[in-house]
């Protein structure tokens, strides 16, 4: 996927932003695969003097949901901090039994542009996220999913998100979901003579 944003922002700055994403999958077997991916949301370099007249921060408009940037939603709306975000990821998919699967994804998050916190440039490495999802298909309509995620912070992430320094170096998130996908069909009723 590749998107460009051009125009004028609400504060009359020129917009020159982009987003691109790519995935390459290698099938190990019929049920097992490895995927290498990269997502890039452009950002504005706040150490530059051009920030008064130009923004390079890509706006997702409504947020990308969980399609990009992991399940922990730390970067659900990357334009909040303005510096953009890069996500290098590796996903392992394993088929378990007849109807089960396990997916594990490791993300490496970095800032593509400089970010200033109190006038000091922040290191671009924000940390790593690990997402694990187990899916058990019960029948053709119902499945159960369970997920666990953890994020390993760097000092830069603490500065970017305004966390209190040295109050723990990771976060945890878990969830359980019942998925129902009914198959709805419409049959034409025959007229009887």
Across the structure, where does each feature detected by a protein language model lie?
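Extracellular/periplasmic loop regions
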Residues: 4-95, 101, 117, 159-161
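Repeated loop/turn-to-beta-strand initiation elements of outer-membrane beta-barrel proteins
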Residues: 31-34, 98-104, 138-146, 184-189
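Outer-membrane beta-barrel "beta-signal"
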Residues: 168-193
């Amino acid at each position: 996927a590749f998107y460009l944003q051009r125009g004028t922002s609400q504060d009359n700055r020129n917009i020159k932003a982009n987003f691109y994403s790519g995935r390459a999958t290698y099938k190990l077997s019929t049920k097992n695969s490895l995927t290498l991916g990269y997502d890039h949301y452009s950002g504005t370099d706040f150490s530059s003097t051009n920030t008064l007249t130009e923004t390079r921060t890509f706006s997702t408009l409504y947020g990308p949901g969980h399609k990009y940037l992991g399940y922990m939603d730390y970067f659900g709306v990357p334009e909040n901090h303005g510096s953009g975000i890069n996500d290098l990821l590796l996903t392992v998919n394993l088929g378990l039994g007849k109807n089960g699967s396990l997916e594990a994804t490791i993300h490496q998050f970095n800032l593509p542009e400089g970010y200033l916190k109190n006038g000091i440039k922040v290191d671009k490495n924000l940390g790593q996220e690990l997402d694990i999802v187990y899916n058990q298909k019960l029948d053709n309509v119902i499945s159960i999913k369970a997920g666990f995620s953890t994020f390993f912070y760097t000092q830069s992430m603490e500065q970017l998100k305004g966390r209190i320094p040295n109050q723990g170096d990771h976060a945890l998130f878990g969830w359980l979901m019942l998925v129902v996908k009914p198959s709805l069909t419409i049959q034409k009723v025959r007229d009887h003579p």
